[in-house]
Design a protein with these regions (language model features):
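N-terminal metal-binding scaffold of metallo-dependent hydrolase/deaminase domains
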Residues: 1-37
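Active-site gating loops and adjacent loop-to-helix segments of metal-dependent hydrolytic enzymes
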Residues: 65-105, 231-249, 275-278
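Histidine/acidic residue-rich metal-binding segments in metalloenzymes
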Residues: 137-151, 167-278, 292-297
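Divalent metal-coordination and catalytic microenvironments
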Residues: 9, 26, 47, 58, ...
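Divalent metal-dependent hydrolysis catalytic cores, especially in the metallo-beta-lactamase
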Residues: 88-99, 107-137, 142-143, 150-163, ...
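C-terminal helical cap
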Residues: 7-12, 116, 272-295
């Protein structure tokens, strides 16, 4: 007997044809015009689309429901499409992390995860800040959420040095401690550093930790209106050098809008060679902050 049978369903592959979907042990076992066998539960899709669940590749899960604590001024600064605005926003938002506590963070994580499940989001890459203010409280709270929701959500916890590693004393050691606690991914945000040398050290250090722990990499790169930022290129080269192709993801990359075409083409070639995926965070496109012109196809 099937656990679930969905009737009168449309799928992306069947067009207007209505089909039935059989599910056993949490897996789809049959899709046909008529699936044989009885089911413990029958759901009538009423001609609606049944499709894959959603993936959220970039969610700061330790910060959900904290806007009032961080302040509207921090959000306003981030919306300024320039280097100073983005950096100032992060600095302002950092102050409230001194009150980070796993006990209230897990409550917020639960609320966000319940909404994710409700709206069909079953995979989340969840960033948790690791620095002298946040300490490991965010990581602990998000790891706890990962375990509580593991039957409904696939949550990957990113140990994320939001305030930098060169400019934030002790951050490198805290990242290692976060990985020892059970974080799944090594994060990074090299553009937050003050010099190009420090940016490169940030990229190299986090990538070396990824190799040490055999983990994937997920970094926020060039998230500023500054055409001179090159941390995405740094990551591409490091990934190729260390043989980590296909195991790194780049987030935001807003500066790509401003690159001249010849450099843009070079960067795209490097991305392909490094097999780096890009999460563009389309909410910023929806808000009309920038409109990148892509070259080629």
């Amino acid at each position: 007997m099937l656990d679930i049978k969905i009737t009168n369903a449309k799928t992306r592959n069947t067009g207007k044809e209505l089909v039935e979907i059989g599910i056993e042990n949490g897996k789809i076992t049959a899709i046909a015009s008529a699936v044989e066998g009885e089911a413990k539960q029958v759901i009538d899709a009423k001609g609606n689309l049944v499709t894959e669940s959603f993936v959220n590749g970039h969610l700061h899960l330790c910060k959900v429901y904290t806007l009032e604590m961080a302040g509207q001024a921090a959000l306003k600064e981030y919306n300024d499409n320039n280097m100073g605005g983005a950096m100032t926003s992060i600095e302002r938002a950092a102050d409230f992390k001194a009150c980070y506590d796993e006990k209230w963070i897990i409550e917020n994580v639960r609320k966000a995860c319940d909404l994710a499940v409700k709206y069909g989001n079953t995979h989340i890459r969840a960033f948790a800040d690791v620095d002298s203010k946040a300490r490991l409280e965010g990581v602990k709270g998000v790891i706890r959420g990962r375990e509580e929701y593991k039957d409904r959500l696939d949550i990957q916890v990113v140990a994320f040095p939001q305030d930098g590693v060169a400019r934030e004393p002790g951050a490198k050691e805290l990242i290692k401690q976060a990985m020892d606690l059970g974080a799944d991914v090594v994060g990074g945000i090299p553009w937050i550093e003050f010099t190009e040398e420090e940016e490169l050290d940030h990229v190299n250090s986090m990538c070396n930790y990824a190799k040490e722990y055999d983990k994937d990499i997920s970094m926020l790169l060039d998230d500023v209106g500054d055409a001179e930022e090159r941390t995405l290129e740094m990551l591409c080269k490091k990934v190729i050098e260390m043989g980590w192709q296909g195991r790194a993801t780049a987030q935001h990359c807003r500066a790509m809008e401003l690159y001249p075409e010849n450099y843009f083409r070079k960067l795209v070639s490097l991305l392909k060679k490094a097999q780096i995926g890009v999460v563009a965070d389309p909410q910023w496109l929806a808000l009309g902050h920038y409109r990148p012109q892509l070259f080629g196809s």
